[in-house]
Amino acid sequence: MLRSVTMLALAIGLTACGDGGQAERVELADYASKLKEFDGRNREIMGQIERLDDPSKDVSAEDLEQVRQFIAAYISDIEKIDPVNLEYRRLRQTHKTYVSKVSQANELAVDTGKPLRNERGNVSIAVRHLEKRTRAHHTALDVLWLQKKIEDPFPLVWPEE
């Protein structure tokens, strides 16, 4: 009798563990599709980098304020993806790390009251920080994608320069 109960418990345990991988795959694919919605904004990041790095283009204080608002909105929307709802632990940790790192762009872009060319440099650094951290996050998600052996192609591709 004890042996039968033990075998039943073992069978239930193995069955329950088997579904965890599939649930994590689905969660990872859903998360990637949420980030896929940021593709247009990622292209805008590349455009902002080109514009801010080109000294032949004039940039006003209002332009810099618009870029700061773009950065703040991007970060705010990333933060709206609630990590509490993520059951896949490594994905949750990756997301939390991404949010903490990408939030630093707000600090880099802050108006310090310096001359416009210095402010332009600060905002450019902030936008590049956003790009760098988002690319790194996509790479981390690609690794998780490969580890989970998801057959669909990885959907997150950074726009070409």
Where are these regions (language model features)?
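Short, charge-rich amphipathic alpha-helices with coiled-coil/heptad character
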Residues: 18-20, 78
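C-terminal motif of bacterial Sec signal peptides marking the signal peptidase cleavage site
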Residues: 13-16
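Short, solvent-exposed, charged loop/turn and helix-capping segments
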Residues: 71-99, 112
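C-terminal amphipathic alpha-helix
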Residues: 21-65, 104-161
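Bacterial N-terminal signal peptides that target proteins for export
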Residues: 1-6
